A protein has these predicted regions:
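Surface-exposed amphipathic alpha-helical tracts and adjacent flexible/coil segments at the periphery
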Residues: 1-250
Length: 250
């Protein structure tokens, strides 16, 4: 029997496999891809015979988060999962962007290929974890994979080391004149990255051509617009451009 295991993403508050809180409290069914994430809301506990007495369960300055689990990240345990005979890895993709799915899937694919080739997983792990942090995520741990979590959850927000800038709509064998659909602001001279199925390639952005006006410019605002830019290696449709998140940029 082939076994699949969930390895990466949000750990939901559920009962008998049915996500109930979102449907009951917001009228949005998690099983239909519309989860309102009520597990992230603030709660207090009230005992039936003590109305009005709000008791903390796990409190910080913002309140309690009794349903808010850390995200699951089993990348550090991947060798053990492979040795155990796991045949399929499940990665959360519901309500996620294409950039998120591409980033996380590529990291796990790279890790699996490394293990299959007999590579040094321990040496590669820091880089793999850093790659996962390039997609929007919450604080994570290994959940119950190693027993009861030491810190099962909290009020952590989203983190992201890279932001999605554009994606390729028409590739080029030599990279010249690659057509991109612009999604976020960047400028010529910035160090940016191209995320492809074969890996992540770093280069310096060059001035680009606005297709609708024919202008060659160094920077553009946010918006859906087709641009052409030379890239120093081959590109293909679906590749992603990304850069440091704005608060990290110089």
């Amino acid at each position: 029997m082939e076994i699949e295991t969930f390895v990466h993403g949000a750990s939901c508050m559920a009962y008998s496999g049915r996500c109930l809180l979102s449907a009951a409290m917001a009228g949005r069914s998690g099983n239909q891809g519309e989860c309102a994430q009520p597990c992230r809301w603030h709660y207090s506990v009230v005992e039936e015979k003590r109305p009005g007495e709000y008791m903390p369960v796990c409190e910080d300055e913002n309140g309690t988060y009794i349903f808010s689990a850390h995200d699951l990240n089993l990348m550090p345990l991947l060798p053990e999962l492979v040795d155990a005979g796991i045949k399929s890895l499940k990665i959360e993709g519901r309500m996620k962007t294409a950039y998120y799915v591409a980033t996380v899937t590529a990291a796990y694919r790279r890790a699996l290929d490394l293990l299959a080739d007999g590579g040094d997983f321990a040496a590669a792990l820091p880089g793999l974890m850093a790659e996962l942090s390039c997609a929007s995520h919450r604080d994570s741990d290994t959940g119950f994979a190693l027993g009861k979590p030491a810190n099962p959850g909290g009020a952590d927000g989203f983190h992201q080391e890279r932001e999605y800038l554009a994606h390729v709509v028409e590739g080029s064998r030599d990279g010249r004149g690659t057509r991109f659909l612009l999604k976020n602001r960047f400028k010529a001279g910035e160090t940016i990255e191209l995320l492809t199925p074969s890996g992540v390639h770093t280069f310096e952005a060059t001035p680009f051509l606005r297709e609708k006006t024919g202008e060659i410019v160094d920077t553009l605002g946010i918006g859906d617009e087709i641009i052409r830019m030379d890239v120093p290696f081959a590109t293909q449709t679906g590749d992603f451009l990304r850069g440091e998140t704005r608060n990290h940029r110089k």
